[in-house]
Amino acid sequence: MIASFFLLNGCSKSAIEQAQQNVLQQYFDDNILNQNYRVHLATDNGADLTSQYSGYVFRLIKGTSFDGPVTATINTTVYNGTWSTNSDYSKLTITLPTTVPEFIFMSREWKFTHKALPIMELAPWGTTEPKVLHMERL
């Protein structure tokens, strides 16, 4: 009887974790992927970089639930890169061509500090660098 309790209890914890994972994945799929974004705010050590991104539209395209292509479009020019996330969707790695100077700031590992759309707020992953990136869904 006691062994059955622990066995059932262990299964329910796994089921709860799987359900939480499914909710996170569904939110990311529905609200982050395949949506158009613009830079709402970009600061690097207090310097406002937002104007550098004026006119750009960014789109994270679903490849798998954890990675895929990203596009940055300005006028008719499209730049291609990649994005990836971790299993709990708390991290977003953006890689864009660093031949475009404004993409150097964006191409890094970010952590989500807020996903309250229409604005997703990001800060550097694993560091306290004073960098901020806010992306607004269009």
Q: What residues fall within each predicted segment?
A:
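C-terminal motif of bacterial Sec signal peptides marking the signal peptidase cleavage site
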Residues: L7-G10
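Lipid interaction determinants
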Residues: S12-Y79, D88-L138
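Sec-dependent N-terminal signal peptides
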Residues: M1-F5
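Acyl-CoA/ACP chain-elongation machinery
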Residues: W83
